[in-house]
Amino acid sequence: MYKRQEAAQTEADVVDGGLRYDLTLPLSRYYANNSANLSAPFKALQVGSVWRADRPQKGRFRQFVQCDIDILGDATNLAEIEEILALTKALKRICPDKAYTVRVNDRAILKGMADYSGFPENETDKVFIILDKMDKIGLDGVREELLAEGYAPEAVEKYTGLLAEIQNDAAGVRALGEKLSGVMDPAKAENLATIMETVKAVADIEFG
């Protein structure tokens, strides 16, 4: 540990003092170094503390516990289905008398929505960061932040219009895929719809 006014000269000076940002990167490093000796697909369940160096925003924490379920080496829908079912099984045991909603998304579909709305391709990551706040600030808040970032009002209205009309079921996902067919392969939406239908057939859950 460094005392006040002491400064590290190189990265090596503080390499032993780092705090874990998330559980994903260490797992990726472990898998890359040991994949030849691991079962395929490789399944991992991790629970541990992670930290944020930046100043936390309201409602967020500098330190919190993260739980990750990962399946590596399986590119089929089975991995996604198994992970969602594992989550629902855990939630039912933790909260047996409480209803819950599982939220799923697909980055390819989110990108298709951004492209359809007319956002510049190199700006989609920034759009996603704002979209990620929707649970906290609502759809109107997302609209306001996008406009504050200087995006074209036409693109913002088109994008928030899509978000407002999405139906959170397999049929709604397929309908969205057809609407985005000019900028995205509808098969991407069909893939997510199939996952939702399969999970719904096994576990009685609601998607949000």
Language-model features and meaning:
Residues A7-V14, D22-D97, R143-G208:
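Positively charged, Gly/Ser-enriched RNA/tRNA-binding surfaces
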Residues M1-Q5:
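Conserved small/polar residues in nucleotide/adenosyl-binding loops
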Residues E121-L131, V142-E145:
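A charged helix-plus-loop insertion that forms the helical arch/lid used to bind
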Residues K98-A108, V127, E206-G208:
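Short, surface-exposed recognition loops or helix-turn segments adjacent to catalytic cores
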Residues R103-S117, D132-G138:
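Short, conserved secondary-structure transition motifs
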Residues P26, A86, I109-M113, K126, ...:
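A general alpha-helix detector
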